[in-house]
Amino acid sequence: MALEIDYVLSHISQEDKIALLAGIDFWHTHPIPELNVPSIRSTDGPNGIRGTKFFAGVPAACLPCGTALASTWDQNLLREVGVLIGKECLAKGAHCWLGPTINMPRSPLGGRGFESFAEDPHLAGAMAASMITGCESTGVISAVKHFVGNDQEHERRAVDVLVTQRALREIYLRPFQIVARDAGPGALMTSYNKINGKHVVESKEMLDMVRQEWKWNPLIMSDWLGTYTTIDSMNAGLDLEMPGPSRYRGRYVESALQARLIKESTIDSRARKVLEFVQQASRAPVSAVETGRDYPEDRALNRNLCANSIVLLKNQNDILPLPKTIKKIALVGSHVRTPAISGGGSASLEPYYTVSLYDAVSEALPHTEILYEVGAYAHKMLPVIDRLLTNAVMHFYNEPVGTERILRATQPMSKTAFQLMDFNAPELNRGLFYATLTGDFTPDVSGVWDFGLTVFGTGLLYVDDELVVDNTTHQTRGTAFFGKGTVQELGSKTLNAGQTYKIRIEYGSANTSPMKAIGVVHFGGGAAHLGACLHVDSAEMVRSAVKAAAEADYTILCTGLNHEWESEGFDRSHMDLPPGIDALITSVLDVAANKTVIVNQSGTPVTMPWADRARGIVQAWYGGNETGHGIADVIFGDVNPSGKLPLSWPVDVKHNPAYLNYASVGGRVLYGEDVYVGYRYYEKVGREVLFPFGHGLSYTTFTVSPDVVFSQEVFRPEEPPTAAVKIKNTGKVAGAQVLQLYISAPHSPTPRPTKELHGFTKVLLQPGEERVAHIRMDKYATNFWDEIEGMWKSEEGIYEALIGTSSQNILAKGTFRVDRTRYWLGL
């Protein structure tokens, strides 16, 4: 029997009606079976569908990270990605996808910058809308997030974002506005932070903007543990508190109702919205059990997506593509055999598979001799034990070790790392429990092995019953596990290759830890990461890498950051590569600069002090399952690179506009750069960047006609004009070029950015082919937020349309006019 909302509301008890307004557990809404109200499942994350388990999860497709997706500048491709996301949700039994993330990476240091799309709100909104449209075409609801201002991780639950109304509207709300207009997703997730003194989840002004001004009526849900009050959040418009069991609704709502602090009509309105969400979501044909769908066509899409996201930053003397006739190639770097497929936090998942660059090069060059050297490790924590681990199992108890214990649950393990935030077992006390992880560790090299144990909770490591690491009483807070974990505590032991040793971790859950922290999210459960590595001689590793590079015909040096450096829960403290990486790159370039290509994997910019010496630099982001294939396809010319930077790439962290106003100080952060975010700032102050917004090279060449032709000379918001230019592929291979339309208001009496992106198109051309490319402006192209009037304003006057292949490479110009000044609100 179908869900009938009016029938449910007329027959439901007050208790059940209030119960609808919060989740029943970590991922599900509250069901009412007797009224045919099913439970709806939500799931992370931004680059793949994890399902209901952080711990021992079902494998999934891992897509490239958000900045990689935006680097394609391809809305049609992102619609396909959205469809794949929707299908993965259906396979995991999930009705609602918690994504995408469209916060603004105002600083390169943001921990979740890799999850977001772009520093430009138009690009971020357009790409997100395409992805959402694809996802919701499968019946799965998208919950776009985080509304609004969750642009840093430091004290994200407590920080007060102080931002002008103009910057809030033009930069931070604009992506949500575009998504509301172009996609209208069924759900919206609020942010953890405050905006100008009020938590967004409690701000009637902010939530009314969505529903009243924008005429968009999604289910509004909290971020996980991002509800802080009963009365204010209910009256502001928050429909659903997540996760469950509820902390601020239930009996507290009943009490507030009796005190007339919440109206009956408000409860009815929130319950109706939840039921509308349930009604829409329950139509999705979800799987009854969580499963995978690792299909060939999905692999092909993921590989194409990865390759098309890659940005060719530098190609001096056309070092790329490399010839496939190479007799000897050196593969150097931490990421050659261990690719960074995603960032950390909500983006984490268990992938179906991972293709390394080593594997991909071996496939592409089957007759080439490969010299492989790590050169320098890039890990922040010692690598988790998996390949050398057998017979691993984890036992759960309510009692600590050394007491009489009753076994409550058992879980086979494939590696020595786990997160237990959503782990449940019958009779296990979620508030306080203990676990013992045992397994057989067989090292492949003799020598001194270093062990590192990081915990959210407490932990002891034993090797053959000898205590090697104690991470219990003297704990120091680190950045792992959403910012709740300790730093890595280290110990060492001499081991023999081929001999099997008994590994044992005695673990206590989160509440056994004495550490406390402000502003971070306490998801509960706990977590641990045990890593191990042969104690290495760093100088000898570099010498071996240099020797390989000197001997080889060409060298690919692949390194960068990973999920330990970029993750939800903390921000980066600097923009540098991990310790020792720059020295490795410099040493290799000293002997092989003319035959070395540098491949960087990171979700946001890193410093490149060696950039002027490198002939080839490739930005490969976090590329998902097909990372190795995508990189190799570009490097050897099977794919002509067409990616464009969605972020400006500063020379130094001190140059970025948020440098003096980043992180929470005294409980607040001042957005002092105002509307001058990213390229808007660098251009306004004349600050040189290493690579500009929109930059990306190709293996072919293009010409663009110098004059922009308009479909109409007068700009009318109700029917914006189209700008057109001719573009020709003048090279020898097929290639795609992204034409970017920037609008400038050079005569405006109001201080404005030099130019702003308001349209783009990606054009694929065969060698010698010429085409007219059309770019449609949107309604917002000439507008800014007038803080006095509290409305959008389009000033009368002459405007410039600038079309180029980056924010700094403008190839065509034209002018148009606005015939009269207009004010407006809404979408």
Swiss-Prot record:
Subcellular location: Secreted
UniProt GO cellular component terms: extracellular region
UniProt signal peptide: none
Protein source organism: Aspergillus oryzae (strain ATCC 42149 / RIB 40)
SUPFAM superfamilies: (Trans)glycosidases, Anthrax protective antigen, Beta-D-glucan exohydrolase, C-terminal domain
Entry-linked InterPro entries: Cellulose_deg_GH3, Fn3-like, Glyco_hydro_3_C, Glyco_hydro_3_C_sf, Glyco_hydro_3_N, Glyco_hydro_3_N_sf, Glycoside_hydrolase_SF, Ig-like_fold
Pathway assignment: Glycan metabolism; cellulose degradation
Glycosylation site residues: 471, 594, 600, 625
Family, as annotated: Belongs to the glycosyl hydrolase 3 family.
Keywords: Carbohydrate metabolism, Cellulose degradation, Glycoprotein, Glycosidase, Hydrolase, Polysaccharide degradation, Secreted
Protein purpose: Beta-glucosidases are one of a number of cellulolytic enzymes involved in the degradation of cellulosic biomass. Catalyzes the last step releasing glucose from the inhibitory cellobiose.
UniProt record, GO biological process: cellulose catabolic process
Domain of life: Eukaryota
Main location: secreted
Organism lineage string: Eukaryota, Fungi, Dikarya, Ascomycota, Pezizomycotina
This protein's encoding gene: bglH
Domain PA14, residue spans: 387-546
Active site per UniProt: 223
Protein name according to UniProt: Probable beta-glucosidase H
Enzyme Commission numbers on file: 3.2.1.21
